[in-house]
Amino acid sequence: MAKLNIVLFEPEIPANTGNIGRTCVAAGTRLHLIEPLGFRLNEKEIKRAGMDYWEHLDVTRYIDFADFLDKNPGAKIYMATTKAKQVYTDVEYEDDCFIMFGKESAGIPEDILVQHPDTAIRIPMLEEIRSLNLGNSVAIVLYEALRQREFEGMKNEGQLTKYEWGSRQPGQERNLTEQRLAAEQGSSHGDAQG
C-alpha cells in the first residue's frame, strides 16, 4: 500500500486532531504534527475523537516547520489552503508526498505558501464561506489521493451483519413501513373516538 503523509501545521483543536488521526489509521496514512500544538496529545478530547485507533497511529512531532523540512529533505509538499489557485483534484499525488493543512484559526502562513506556488491546492466552496472544518478538509483531499490509487490495499466492499445483499425484495421495507404507519393511524383514530 502506498504511503501518504498528512501534515497539520500548529493544530489548535484536539477533537479535530483526534478525528484526523482516526482517518489516517483507516487510510494507512502517516500523521505529522508541527508544533506548537494548541493542546496536549494526552487530552481526552483527542482520545475520544480518535477512539481506540489512536494507539495504531503512525505519528511524528516536529518543534517547528524548519524541523519538519530538516527531517523530510526533498519532500513534495502540497499546501491545502483557501488562498490557492488550483483545485485539489487537479494534481496527481505521488507516493510518499505530504499534504499539509494549517491551523484552524489562520491556515498556513503566507510566507510558507509563497514558497510552494505549484503545490498549493484548494477545496472549492461558496465564496461567502471562510473555510471548511479541518477534519473534513483532510478527509476530502486524502480520499482523492487514495482514489487516484484506486484505493490500493483498502477494503472496498462491506457486508451486512444480519442480511446478505440482495436477499430482500426491493421495496419490501417500504411496504412494511407503510403498513406500520397505517396501523398506528388506525389505533390513534380509535383512541380519539373512544
Can you name each region flagged by the protein language model?
Residues M1-G194:
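Post-transcriptional modification and biogenesis factors for structured RNAs
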